[in-house]
Amino acid sequence: GKSSFDERNPLSLGSANRTAPKTVWKYLGDSDTIFAIGSSLTITNYGITIPSGKNIIHSTNNYEDINKDYDVEVSLLGDSKLVLQKMIECIKNNYSKNIASLEKKNIVMSEIKKVKEEWASEWNTLLNSPMNPINPYRLVNEINNNIDHENTIVTHDAGHPRDQMMPFITATTPGSYIGWGKSTHLGYGIPL
C-alpha cells in the first residue's frame, strides 16, 4: 500500500490507483520489469493496468492470484515481509557494492527527482490556487504541508477525494495513509 514505503525516499515513485504521480506513469512505461509484492494484480477499473510487454515478478500469499490476470515470469509465493527481506538481502549481496550499480542508482535518483519537480510545477497552480470556494487540490496541499507526517494517519472518502488525495499526500511511515480500495459508498470509506 501507499504508506508501506517512505515517499520522501529518493527512489520512491509514489503509488497509484486511477490517479498517480507523473513518476509512476513514466517508470511504468519505461521499465522492462515490474515487481508486484502483496498484490493480487487484479485488473480493475479502479486501478492502473500494467502495459503489455513487461516482465512481471509477482509476490503474493495466495496461489490463486498467480497468472490470474497477467502472465508472470517469476512467481514468489509467501509472506510479503519475508519475500522482501530475502530480495533486499539478494540485492545487497549482489549489487550494493558494485560501483557501476551505485552510479546507475545515483542517475536514476536524479531522474526521479527531475520528474517529481516537473510534476510539481505542472500542478503548482491548482495546488496553490487562491480560488474561492477553495479548490480541493489546494485543500489537500494545505493538509500535506501542515500535518505532522510521522504522527498523523490520513485517509479519504470514496470517489474523487481518493483520486485527489492519493497522489499528493506524502506518506512517510507504515500506516500513515490508509486508502480504501475499489468501490465504497460515499460516507462509508471507513468500516463502521
Segment roles from a protein language model:
Residues 1, 33, 149-153:
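Catalytic alpha/large subunits of respiratory electron-transfer oxidoreductases
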